[in-house]
Structures are given as C-alpha cells and as structure tokens.
Regions:
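Amide-donor transfer/coupling interface in amidating biosynthetic enzymes
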Residues: 26-136
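Cysteine-nucleophile active-site neighborhood
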Residues: 1-31
Length: 136
C-alpha cells in the first residue's frame, strides 16, 4: 500500500510464486544503519511484490520478491509481518488455507515450527525499529 502510494509498481510474481510462511531476508547497508541486527527469516503472507519507488531507499531484500523493506523520508514499508502473533498465524492459515497451495508457499505446520525458531529475533527487531522510528 505504502509503496504503491509512493510510486512503486505492485505486481504478481512472474511465475505465480508466493511467500507464505518464513523466508530469509538480507538487510542492505542502509538497512543496517536503521537497525544493526535483522532477523534471519521473517513471516510473509503475500503473493504480490513491488518495485522500489523513485527516491526510496532499499533496506532489505529477498530471493523471491527482491524488495522487502524500504524507507522514504520518515515513511517505511515492510513486505513481511514482524507483528504476527500465534493467534493471527492460526487465523490466517485457517481462513486463508488456499494460499498454502500457491507455488513457493510453505506447508501450514512449518509456520508454527518456524515461529518457535524465528519469532524472538523478529520481535526484538520490531522493538528496536519502532523505538527508533518513534524517536525520529
């Protein structure tokens, strides 16, 4: 939503792939200036990506959808969901179970197994990110 408003193009993956479950991301140098430590893998729930809007700064990238986090001034856009809770994940994977049939989507049980591995680092990242964003 934010990326589209900033002039980025939103698109489906050319091969119909989705990111549904946990996937690795890589912070850029600019991303490491925002938060020094990023989670290795983050929770995703999407089948669309977006191009880097004109004038935006790439903060993190991924393999299936390259643009994972951007900044433009004080506005940030994330492709991933560091805010996801166990209840949200249960609801999304129950009501949106058809998404797990998309190419590249992870099986439902791995969402919960991977959450036990990656949730702490994603939450720690989110705490630091929000604190720095609020302080400006």
């Amino acid at each position: 939503l934010c990326a589209k408003h900033l002039g980025g193009k939103v698109f489906n993956h050319p091969h119909g792939h989705a990111e549904v479950g946990y996937y690795p991301i890589r912070p850029t140098v600019a991303g490491l200036e925002v938060v020094e430590t990023w989670p290795e893998c983050v929770y995703q729930w999407h089948r669309e990506g977006f191009d880097l809007p004109p004038g935006a700064e790439l903060l993190a990238e991924g393999d299936t959808f390259e643009v994972q986090a951007i900044r433009m001034g004080r506005a940030f856009a994330l492709q991933f969901h560091p805010e996801v809770t166990h209840a949200m994940m249960h609801r999304w994977t129950t009501h949106g179970h058809e998404r797990m049939q998309l190419p590249g989507a992870r099986p439902r049980h791995t969402h919960f197994v991977d959450r036990a591995v990656y949730d702490y680092s994603a939450r720690a990242w989110l705490d630091v990110f929000l604190e720095r964003w609020i302080r400006g």
